[in-house]
Amino acid sequence: MNAIWIAVAAVSLLGLAFGAILGYASRRFAVEDDPVVEKIDEILPQSQCGQCGYPGCRPYAEAISCNGEKINRCAPGGEAVMLKIAELLNVEPQPLDGEAPELTPARMVAVIDENNCIGCTKCIQACPVDAIVGATRAMHTVMSDLCTGCNLCVDPCPTHCISLQPVAETPDSWKWDLNTIPVRIIPVEHHA
């Protein structure tokens, strides 16, 4: 019985010693995060889609802050995110990467063919922004307002019932080019 207590005490002392060493090492050798990277990462949409060429939003934020990467490569965030990052870094805003001024690619949204959906939830698990709703063995649907069109839900679908389709243009989503609209100033004549 005495040997058991000695073994318990020895293991407890070893655990306490190693815990103290690990606690000291975690504080002594801690790596401080760059606050600029944190702020950029908060601005990015966290869709982790990889359209910028990086595996996620955090690596892209690090590349912007540390490597001088362009701030205009986030497709899901679009112009709003690019403008916020430009304001944060005090740099000049740039046109979105790959976007020709005259020819903007149509915004895409995932659409589920609900007649063929088997309710496997693989698309829900793949969606980084939780834009797909449904339950196991029940019909799923996409909330188009939340969908970023990242295409991550298409491949996991075993029945191939998910496709990306362009969003229909409405007066609210239309990008009005006010510089090309002809404006004529009509002089006002005052008659007494």
Swiss-Prot record:
GO MF assignments: 4 iron, 4 sulfur cluster binding; electron transfer activity; metal ion binding
Q: Which UniProt keywords apply?
A: 4Fe-4S, Cell inner membrane, Cell membrane, Electron transport, Iron, Iron-sulfur, Membrane, Metal-binding, Repeat, Translocase, Transport
Gene Ontology biological process terms in this record: electron transport chain
Q: Which residues bind [4Fe-4S] cluster 1?
A: C49, C52, C57, C74
Return the EC number.
Answer: 7.-.-.-
What cofactors does the UniProt entry give for this protein? [4Fe-4S] cluster
Q: Where does [4Fe-4S] cluster 2 bind?
A: C117, C120, C123, C157
Short name of any one Pfam family annotated for the protein: FeS
Question: In which broad location class does this protein mainly occur, judging by the first location in its UniProt entry?
Answer: membrane
**Record-linked PROSITE patterns:** 4FE4S, 4FE4S_FER_1, 4FE4S_FER_2
Q: Which InterPro entries match?
A: 4Fe-4S_dom (IPR007202), 4Fe4S_Fe-S-bd (IPR017896), 4Fe4S_Fe_S_CS (IPR017900), 4Fe4S_Ferredoxin_RnfB (IPR050395), Elect_transpt_cplx_RnfB/RsxB (IPR010207), RnfB/RsxB_Proteobac (IPR016463)
Concerning Gene3D superfamilies, the annotation shows:
3.30.70.20, Electron transport complex subunit B, putative Fe-S cluster (1.10.15.40)
Instruction: Please give the SUPFAM superfamilies that the UniProt record associates with this protein.
Output: 4Fe-4S ferredoxins
Query: Where is it found, in Gene Ontology cellular component terms?
Result: plasma membrane
- Which regions span the lipid bilayer? none
- Which positions are annotated as binding [4Fe-4S] cluster 3? C127, C147, C150, C153
Give compartment(s): Cell inner membrane
Segments carrying the region annotation (Hydrophobic) are 1-26
Record has Iron as a keyword: yes
Q: How is the cofactor bound?
A: Binds 3 [4Fe-4S] clusters.
- Please give the function described in this protein's UniProt entry: Part of a membrane-bound complex that couples electron transfer with translocation of ions across the membrane. Required to maintain the reduced state of SoxR.
Subunit (UniProt): The complex is composed of six subunits: RsxA, RsxB, RsxC, RsxD, RsxE and RsxG.
Protein name according to UniProt: Ion-translocating oxidoreductase complex subunit B
The organism is Escherichia coli O127:H6 (strain E2348/69 / EPEC)
